[in-house]
Regions:
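Conserved core of the sugar-phosphate nucleotidyltransferase
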Residues: 101-193
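Short glycine-enriched, charge-decorated loop/helix-capping segments at active-site entrances
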Residues: 17-23, 70-72
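A short, N-terminal amphipathic alpha-helix
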Residues: 27-45
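Short internal beta-strands
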Residues: 45-49, 128-129
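Conserved SAM-binding loop
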Residues: 21, 47, 98
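Catalytic donor-sugar/metal-binding loop of nucleotide-sugar-dependent glycosyltransferases
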Residues: 177-197, 202-217
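N-terminal nucleotide-binding beta1-loop-alpha1 segment
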Residues: 1-15
Length: 217
């Protein structure tokens, strides 16, 4: 298996969020790198960034560095273009795991890989998700996953829904090439019950710091 880590340093909401200190002297990248090295060889890890300073971080762990075109950064990037640019240079025909560093609390990679090995013949991809139990309304206040009045259902009886965590995706190489997306057409849902905080804003960063520190004892 090859691992791809997309690592932007140009976040407009949190400056250098992926490489600034998060816990003690470790950045979000450092934390994820150490988690990955618990189950994968460093030569199988490929890090894509628009900033050449990240190469020094990759050298520290023995990871492969891929310099990214700045045009493939930001929130307006066409996802298939990004997926293709980051996965085409990765050698081999084995599976690809796409791992984000912005979810430091997620560390169930070993269990996910074991489950993937068991279901790989029946699915083209794996996506890490968390069960969602809540009552949803659209922007016109119409119920989405339940009904008002007599037909109301308590949360325990709502139809199963899942939140994509953006922490881990695993895809067969042919699925990556064909669909050029994080998820194939027949994904396996890897369900985690662990607390997960995806860091998009400064408040998320600070909250994740508190929780991560608590979990470290």
């Amino acid at each position: 298996m090859k691992i791809v880590i997309p690592l932007q340093t140009c976040s407009s909401r949190i400056k250098h969020k992926n490489i600034r200190p998060f816990y003690e002297d470790d950045s979000l990248f450092d934390i994820k790198a150490k988690q990955i090295l618990a189950f994968e060889k460093p030569e199988n890890v490929y890090v894509s960034s628009e900033n050449s300073i990240v190469k020094d971080l990759c050298d520290k762990y023995g990871f492969n560095f891929m310099l990214r075109d700045p045009a493939l950064c930001g929130n307006e990037v066409y996802q298939p273009d990004l997926i293709k640019a980051l996965t085409d240079p990765v050698p081999g025909d084995d599976d690809i795991a796409w791992i984000q560093v912005t979810s430091p609390l997620f560390n169930e990679f070993i269990r996910a890989i074991k489950e993937w090995e068991q279901v790989r013949n029946q699915h083209d991809s794996l996506v890490a998700v968390k069960r969602f139990k809540g009552h949803l309304l659209d922007d016109k206040a119409n119920p989405v996953n339940y009904a008002f009045g007599y037909w109301h259902k308590v949360s325990q009886k709502l139809p199963p829904l899942y939140t994509v965590l953006w922490s881990l995706f695993i895809l067969k190489r042919e699925a990556v090439k064909k669909f050029q997306y994080h998820i194939g057409v027949n994904p396996y849902l890897f369900v985690t019950e662990s607390m997960v905080i995806d860091i998009d804003y400064e408040e998320d960063f600070e909250l994740a710091q508190i929780v991560y520190k608590k979990l470290q004892g």
